[in-house]
Design a protein with these regions (language model features):
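FAD-dinucleotide binding site
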Residues: 1-316
């Protein structure tokens, strides 16, 4: 099961090409939330195939043109507007510590020591937290599901946002370079030029571990080394205002960026992870998506819809 790194090296060697474009594959890995040495080439190709199978209408690939989201509307705002009646039922800052599904009635315990009963539970716990085992399942989850949790990976990662005094890139929407951060996107691409002044960089895997430990000045220097290749060191110095990094690994209840295909049978692992247990436990979350949208908010939302539909069908 070769990694994306090994696979790329073999392809280049077989075609007698130099590795000058290796960074493109490394950047692809960063978008997938990991270092390219940790991504299974087969697992990644299988996910691409899933997406092709799911979107089989070339003229209308997923109706994306109907769902363009631009500021000031965030994804959170869209959720609030769509599901506003349910928000009063959401209990925040209440971490679940145990799920006992050994009897007909399921008992869910939280960090405050309170117990909640239900006939069924939809579980959206992030993969990294499932791997830590901080939520106790009684009885233990089926072996196939535990093996899937062990095989799938979710490592540190996040995004850095760099604000400039003015737009230095015109209508360009992305930068790719063989630097510390390979992939940069323009967050204000759909905005007017005068509002389009922020660049977003994917910081994943080893780079995320380095970046989060660096001082802000050292982070700024790393960003300068990358971005000066596109609009020069002087322009960077004259127009840089500030930058902000957010890594999901810093969030105690999330623990990482998002899942990625770390093994050749990653698709089978995601199918095992999403399987219902005894018509009691229903699993959702981006890591359970099998339509090529794992690692995305879209995949997470779709998985929640799928789990809810499975539950309703079982309780008809």
């Amino acid at each position: 099961d070769p990694s994306l790194n090994d696979y790329t090296a073999k392809i280049l060697a077989d075609n007698k090409k130099c590795g000058s474009h290796d960074f493109l594959y490394r950047g692809l890995a960063h978008m997938w939330g990991a270092d390219w040495s940790n991504i299974s080439a087969k697992g990644m190709l299988d996910m691409d195939k899933e997406l092709e199978d799911f979107i089989n209408d070339e003229k209308d690939p997923g109706d994306f043109e109907n769902y363009l989201i631009v500021p000031p509307f965030s994804q959170a705002e869209i959720l609030k507007r769509t599901f506003e009646p349910l928000f009063s039922e959401v209990k925040l800052n209440t971490r679940v510590t145990e799920i006992n599904y050994g009897s007909k009635e399921i008992i869910v315990k939280d960090q405050l020591g309170q117990s909640h009963s239900a006939d069924a539970v939809i579980i959206t716990i992030p993969l990294a937290i499932l791997k830590k085992g901080t939520v106790k399942f009684t009885p233990t989850l089926p072996q196939k599901k535990r093996e899937a949790i062990e095989k799938l990976q979710m490592t540190p990662g996040g995004k850095v946002f760099i604000k400039f005094k003015k737009n230095l890139w015109g209508d360009t929407w992305s930068f790719q370079n063989d630097g510390f951060i390979v992939m940069y996107l323009i967050t204000g691409y759909h905005q007017e030029p005068e509002k389009n002044t922020v660049v977003e960089g994917f910081v994943m895997g080893q780079e995320a571990e380095i970046f989060v430990k660096a001082s802000k000045e050292k982070q700024r220097e790393l960003l300068k080394q990358d971005l000066q290749a596109f609009f020069g060191a002087e322009a960077f110095e004259e127009n840089y205002e500030d930058h902000f990094y957010f890594g999901w690994e810093s969030q105690e209840d999330i623990g990482g960026a998002y899942s990625f295909p770390s093994v050749a049978d990653a698709a089978d692992c995601r199918k095992a992870l999403r399987e219902t247990v005894d018509k009691k436990l229903y699993f959702a979350g981006e890591a359970t998506d099998c339509n090529g949208y794992s690692q995305t908010v879209s995949g997470a939302l779709y998985s929640g819809k799928r789990a809810a539909e499975e539950l309703m069908k079982d309780f008809e």
